[in-house]
């Protein structure tokens, strides 16, 4: 985990990561007690919906767009968890959100560029990114404590 670190939005260090600094949005969707994961291609690992910022988008708009584009999910509310600062392969900042969802798409609703959508009680294997578990643990901690 030397290449990535999570900073909670409740931490004073979070001020170092203003929204304009975020290049990626990562969303941890919960379907009840299960987490929703996607696999973009069959040979890659599982990941949370994640996308890069397009010209003119806010990071919140990126998160909403990616939820729809990768999982056909519309969330009524996105809660900001914090940021992940990654240094490998190049420095980047990701804003991490979580949300509650009421609907998970059927197989015929899955976007063409997504191989699978799954709901899990634990982290599935293989993971596309090692820091997915760090992000999941932060989201689970927020759900347990109720501190958002």
Predicted segments, located by residue:
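A short coil-to-beta-strand element that immediately follows conserved catalytic motifs
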Residues: 73-83
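Active-site-adjacent beta-strand/loop module that shapes the phosphate/pyrophosphate-binding cleft
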Residues: 84-107, 118-120, 135-139
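Residues that flank catalytic or metal-binding motifs in active/ligand-binding sites
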Residues: 23, 93-95, 113
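Conserved Nudix-box catalytic region and its N-terminal flanking loop in Nudix hydrolases
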Residues: 30-70
């Amino acid at each position: 985990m030397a290449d990535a670190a999570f900073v909670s939005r409740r931490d004073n260090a979070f001020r170092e990561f203003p929204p304009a600094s975020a290049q990626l949005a990562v969303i941890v969707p919960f379907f009840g007690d299960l987490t929703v994961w996607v696999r973009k291609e069959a040979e890659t690992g599982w990941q949370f919906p994640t996308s890069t910022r397009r010209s003119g988008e806010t990071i919140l708009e990126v998160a909403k767009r990616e939820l729809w584009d990768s999982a056909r999910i519309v969330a009524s509310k996105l809660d900001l968890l914090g940021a992940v600062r990654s240094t490998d392969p190049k420095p980047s900042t990701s804003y991490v959100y979580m949300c509650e969802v009421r609907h998970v798409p059927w197989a015929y609703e899955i976007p063409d560029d997504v191989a699978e959508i799954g709901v899990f009680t634990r982290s599935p294997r293989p993971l596309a990114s090692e820091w997915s578990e760090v992000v999941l643990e932060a989201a689970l901690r927020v759900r347990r404590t109720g501190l958002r």
